[in-house]
């Protein structure tokens, strides 16, 4: 796979093609663009990450200080797409499969053509709406570890991200997938918990991983409690795990009904208690990050 070779230079990424000629584009990271805000949402499966991200999309899209908003569904299950009522035409996983097919075809011309138009192919996966743009990562047919292909795609995604003022990422339970496939660093990490003991253990694991991988400093690690019943205390965290709590979202029958019916959560009224809670959470986040 010749086109998987790279020559790294500060701020620049070169994709080395079979004929030895590098295809160049800028390599961007969150740290290089202090005016852009990158928010990632993680947590144990089933705690409501996608619902929170959908309502955050709704809230951010109606703020005057958000700027251009990009929403990335980085969970292979595409739960956020469903919560937003979106059917992705293309996914980054599809682009990855196309890259792998070209690399294994043995055709130097196919490899070169894919590498040269990679940024354009990734851009074509973007879906633009009135209030935001949407990008789906999806699930690749080939589950093998191809680090160089992942690096290629991450470079192209980071090139795309630079044109947005705010990026919201719905991730899987862990952090490594966001770091490996989407962007090298985030500004704010929101961990979602339903208050259960299992969710608390996931919060603790993510807290430890954030420090180990240097993905986000602890002062940028936030916690949101979802589906909270009045008077019920969430499970306690380890004494050394001290995320900033942004707020809690109440158990809401209207949101549950929307979810069961497959209706986009962005159609919830601004008077809905869950949306009002998320609107407050977004305001709180922007004040503290």
Predicted region positions:
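Hydrophobic positions on the alpha1 helix immediately C-terminal to the Walker A/P-loop
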Residues: 52
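C-terminal lobe/tail of nucleotide-utilizing enzymes
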Residues: 2-24, 211-289
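Extreme N-terminal, non-catalytic leader segments
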Residues: 1-47, 55-68, 77-79
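Short gly/ser/thr-rich secondary-structure transition/capping motifs
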Residues: 21-24, 114-119, 170-173, 206
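Conserved beta-strand scaffold positions in the cores of enzyme catalytic domains, especially
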Residues: 38, 71, 132-134, 245-248
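The start of beta-strands in P-loop NTPase/AAA+ ATPase cores
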Residues: 37-38, 68-70, 165, 221
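Conserved catalytic-core segment of NTP-binding enzymes
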Residues: 148-248, 257
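P-loop/Walker-type NTP enzyme "switch/lid" segment
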Residues: 76-158, 260
